[in-house]
Amino acid sequence: SALWGLSLTISMLVVAVISPFLGALADYSGRKKTLLFVMTAISIVFTGLLFLVEKGDIFIGMLFFIIAEIGYRSGQVFYNSLLVDVADKDEIAKVSGNGWAIGSVGGIVCLLVVLVLIQLNPGNPFYIRLSLVITAVFYALFAIPAFLWIKEQHRPQKRDGKSLFKVAIER
């Protein structure tokens, strides 16, 4: 559990450092939905790859988890930036809350599925590892509506000749 905490700390520190750049990228690129897709795909792929991690594969397990978590948390930057494209200013909180609620329902359903699977096969590490593939599949399925239904309004802000890095630092 200490190594899981360390992995989470590393991933959150990376996201804290890169978030200003990601925010600038969201605001100035006009590609929020594409960037959300990339980060979501990274998170899904590396969550699924955790299936390959077996007992004793500590480094690779931590690495896959860190990358999956960075993809997930970085994706939230782009998810949040899309709120202005799907809701009026007075509806943003409601739309955001509903989005999180739907995602949470998917997470709870997934948890129940893998919990039953693991309980029916106690002590079998294969089913514990398989739960990560199932989680990746649920994640992908529950992400599909966002990519199908969200209509991004390409409104990249002007950088006035500044690099994204400089814009991110100056904000």
Residue ranges: model-predicted function:
Residues W4-A24, L111:
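Central cavity-lining transmembrane alpha-helices of secondary-active solute carriers
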Residues K151-R171:
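Juxtamembrane intracellular "pre-TM" segments in multi-pass secondary transporters
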Residues A26-A41:
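Cytoplasmic membrane-interface "Motif A"-like loop-to-helix N-cap segments
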Residues V14, A93-L117:
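Glycine-rich segments within core transmembrane alpha-helices of 12-TM secondary carriers
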Residues F51-F65, N121:
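Helix-loop junctions at membrane interfaces in 12-TM secondary transporters
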Residues C110-Q119, A136-P156:
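C-terminal membrane-cytosol helix-exit motif in multi-pass small-molecule transporters
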Residues F37-G56:
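C-terminal ends and interior cores of transmembrane alpha-helices
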Residues F64-A101:
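Cytoplasmic helix-loop-helix junction between adjacent transmembrane helices
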